[in-house]
UniProtKB/Swiss-Prot annotation:
SMART domains in the record: UBCc
UniProt-listed Gene3D superfamilies: 6.10.140.820, 6.10.250.370, Ubiquitin Conjugating Enzyme
GO molecular function, one term: calcium-dependent protein binding
Function summary: Component of the ESCRT-I complex, a regulator of vesicular trafficking process. Binds to ubiquitinated cargo proteins and is required for the sorting of endocytic ubiquitinated cargos into multivesicular bodies (MVBs). Mediates the association between the ESCRT-0 and ESCRT-I complex. Required for completion of cytokinesis; the function requires CEP55. May be involved in cell growth and differentiation. Acts as a negative growth regulator. Involved in the budding of many viruses through an interaction with viral proteins that contain a late-budding motif P-[ST]-A-P.
Main location: cytoplasm
Membrane topology: Peripheral membrane protein
Identification of the protein by name: Tumor susceptibility gene 101 protein
Modified residue annotations for Phosphothreonine: T220
Length: 390
């Protein structure tokens, strides 16, 4: 039964980026029907636990012309997608984890895609596609061999010395204190049946056969054989644990190097900003000093002019730079004086101070003179290269 979007939102209701998580989950379960969202308790390495959603099921992986259903479990942290998911291979009872550079003995998956995870360039669909490619080159699980009893010893034939998949029959690759399937991570339920056929070697890639020490003449396994097998299993486990820690340390070192580079770049940018600010402060101080100096000069000039204002002729305050400009100024002043005179004559006529004949006589004379002044001023402005005023 497909999980609805409302059910997904309820599962990730405590997630910081709920909508992004739901959108990516819907895209994944739409494309990979065998992956199902499950809400479960995840136990961290420090012993703390948290309710998280995981995608558990199988993904199709092509290997040597056949397609195998590889069981995985993807735990989504509550800060997803800004933190990568925690990924595991989850073998069934008929499978065994094949440790390698991408999968440790606990089934945890290590990929460069996870170490370099960066939203929005990284997402669940891209992660699953990378897993399919990587697992197609190096399968993370192989089918567990069928246990076979040893035949009775015959004096005329050699003992049976070849077994699959590389361990003496009936001997676990772990000491008695370890379970066959380590459980350092939370369990994820898987659908039974079809996707994982029983134990035939054609359903999952098998490891090549190796030669081991055979049973003793009485049909039992000697203590030396058991001891050697246990030592080999423990050595392999320690070797892969050490490689896991080294890879993790290398990943942290690479992350620290990138952080150091970012800090150096940031430090350089800050130094450039400080230098630029110092230059701007120096320029502002220089402009302030210049403004103070000009203000003092203006204050001194104003004080000097105020002291001399009683002896100054108002007509001599404005002195044009050329005689032509002085002529234009005088013509303009005289023309405006005539304009004011005509205005006040009109006011006198309106109030009855003068009669109409006197008004018309003076207005006629003033208008004629005003016309002559305007014509002369237009000619002077044209000679001076100025625009027309009327």
């Amino acid at each position: 039964m497909a999980v609805s979007e409302s059910q997904l939102k309820k599962m990730v209701s405590k997630y910081k980026y709920r909508d992004l998580t739901v959108r990516e989950t819907v895209n994944v379960i739409t494309l990979y029907k065998d992956l199902k969202p499950v809400l479960d308790s995840y136990v961290f390495n420090d012993g703390s636990s948290r309710e998280l959603m995981n995608l558990t099921g199988t993904i199709p992986v092509p290997y040597r012309g056949n397609t195998y259903n590889i069981p995985i479990c993807l735990w989504l942290l509550d800060t997803y997608p800004y933190n990568p998911p925690i990924c595991f291979v989850k073998p069934t009872s008929s499978m065994t984890i094949k440790t390698g550079k991408h999968v440790d003995a606990n089934g945890k998956i290590y990929l460069p895609y996870l170490h370099e995870w960066k939203h929005p360039q990284s997402d669940l669909l891209g992660l699953i596609q990378v897993m399919i490619v990587v697992f197609g080159d190096e399968p993370p699980v192989f089918s567990r061999p069928i246990s076979a009893s040893y035949p009775p010893y015959q004096a005329t034939g050699p003992p049976n010395t070849s077994y699959m998949p590389g361990m003496p029959g009936g001997i676990s690759p772990y000491p008695s204190g370890y379970p066959p399937n380590p459980s350092g991570y939370p369990g994820c339920p898987y659908p039974p049946g079809g996707p994982y056929p029983a134990t035939t070697s054609s359903q999952y890639p098998s490891q090549p056969p190796v030669t081991t020490v055979g049973p003793s003449r009485d049909g039992t396994i000697s203590e030396d054989t058991i001891r050697a097998s246990l030592i080999s299993a423990v050595s392999d486990k320690l070797r892969w644990r050490m490689k896991e820690e080294m890879d993790r340390a290398q990943a942290e070192l690479n992350a620290l190097k990138r952080t150091e580079e970012d800090l150096k770049k940031g430090h350089q940018k800050l130094e450039e900003m400080v230098t630029r600010l110092d230059q701007e402060v120096a320029e502002v101080d220089k402009n302030i000093e210049l403004l103070k100096k000009k203000d003092e000069e203006l204050s001194s000039a104003l004080e000097k002019m105020e002291n001399q204002s009683e002896n100054n002729d108002i007509d001599e305050v404005i002195i044009p730079t050329a005689p032509l400009y002085k002529q234009i100024l005088n013509l303009y002043a005289e023309e405006n004086a005539i304009e004011d005179t005509i205005f006040y004559l009109g006011e006198a006529l309106r109030r009855g101070v003068i009669d109409l004949d006197v008004f018309l006589k003076h207005v006629r004379l003033l208008s004629r003179k005003q016309f002559q002044l305007r014509a002369l001023m237009q000619k002077a402005r044209k000679t001076a290269g100025l625009s027309d005023l009327y």
